[in-house]
Amino acid sequence: MKRFAAALLAISLVLGLSACSSPAPELQEFTDGVHERDEVYPAHIETKSVALGGLGIHFSTSAFDETASPELAQKVAEDYSALSGAGETDIYIINGPLTDAPFVSGAELFCTAEAVESGEYRPALVSAALGITGRWQAEGLSRELFGGEVPDGLADEIAAYLAAHEGSNLLSLAPFYFTEDFADAETIALASDCAQSLAAYVIGEAGQDALRGSCAEYLPGWLKSLGLEAETDGLQTLMELDWTQNVYYPAEFTRSVFTFRPVPTEWMTDADAASAYVLRLCTGLDWLLDYLETNAPESWARIEQTRPYEVRFEENIDASCTDVYSAVVHLRAPSAGLHELAHALTIDEPCGEAGWVFEGVAMHCTEWWISYEDYGIFFDLMENIDTVEGASEDERFIFGEIRRIFKELSGVDASEAQTLESPAIPLVKAMTYAMLLHPERDVFIKMVSKPTGDVMSSFYKPRYPSTELSHAKSYAFCEYLLEHGYLTFDQLAAASLDLEGYRAAFPTDEYFDELYAGYLDWLREEFGS
């Protein structure tokens, strides 16, 4: 009975929407035109164009055929007329488009003649003509309007997929599940079926206009209608992201001041992995913003004015970094994600003297986010250094010290590190303390990807022990200053923002040296063996 009702609803939707549409107007004469290059679609296109009411159809001159193009334009006009409430729309049918899939920018659509002939362009047409920008919403409504069918066993197919892909975010219907960059044909087909089913449910509950929103609030009800149960908080977070299209990237979304442009990487190989990492990163960013606003109220006025940043996911760079001058965050590894976002928020006017504070502040805000797996190699060495073939005597000694100090800090043995909520915090402190307590040992732990003397000496305060300085040592010193009341986090955040804030916290080199000497004395007293 439930299936019959759902089928009846789908039929009534298509019939009702079609009844409201208008017949396609007759073609007029084609005229010469041009699409000027712009930031969104950077291509100069000379065209043969025809206007049909609110619809403009533009063939690039290389794609125009005097016989075939009028027939294709008539097909587009018929599809457009099936869309009730369609606004003014321009469709560019071109050879060699900038993207393999149809691309939408506002009310403009760019695609190939083959995409029109096959119907592949229809979700993009729905998006451009009706202002429905969500990827799954456009896909689902397009299938509803143009005769797509949801299989009777959709719930079983979803259940089977989720059973085979533990932790999958398929039900978020994030754009990753609709693109060949991240998903195979079977996954895309299942996501499309889900999109149509959910779109029909939303229309039945609130009408077609509701599809212009995220529709996250309808997810629990839709799942219930299918007889499925799932934890929806994370799924709804992904649905609520401000997803957009970009000609150079398979997916794009904005959160706070950051525009993220995910691409396949070694840690985001498919839709499930990409959506999981994006969810983790966005959840961390939300926490970070709240922490900065709450704990650095004096600096927050500056922080919330941070200019927009682009976040790129890249594997062809040496290390993750934040380019403050060009406002670009480069992510080379998953563990660096929130750390680099913290840099973007807490560095306004870079100065070399404050370099170590940059790192300390960023790690203070984000080290809880680092997982056991992110620092797996260090946990493994701490626990098993005695059995590592080729390890030097100094390395065995240092990691033995790290193991001892880690237990003092955390209360658990190295073998139990995974039971801790934030295992990276005691690990990084233990590594730092062990290195500072035993500078005579010939060991260097790489907590940065390029720990060269040139980089260190040019970036960090010269009088600080720059040849030994790392992110971890900066972090541990900042933690000491905070825990012993020498500075508030607000003061440290201000010190990271610009030179004026740094000088307010550390007015002279002598004062800095005094603080650091006191830190080393405390370290020897508390953790010296």
What is each of the regions a protein language model found here?
Residues 103-163, 324-434:
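Zinc-dependent metallopeptidase catalytic helix centered on the HExxH motif
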Residues 44-135, 151, 254-354:
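Juxtacatalytic substrate-recognition/specificity segment
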Residues 1-4:
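Positively charged n-region of N-terminal signal peptides that target proteins for export
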Residues 22-34, 49-52, 58, 63-64, ...:
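Beta/coil-rich, acidic/histidine-enriched accessory regions frequently appended to metallopeptidases
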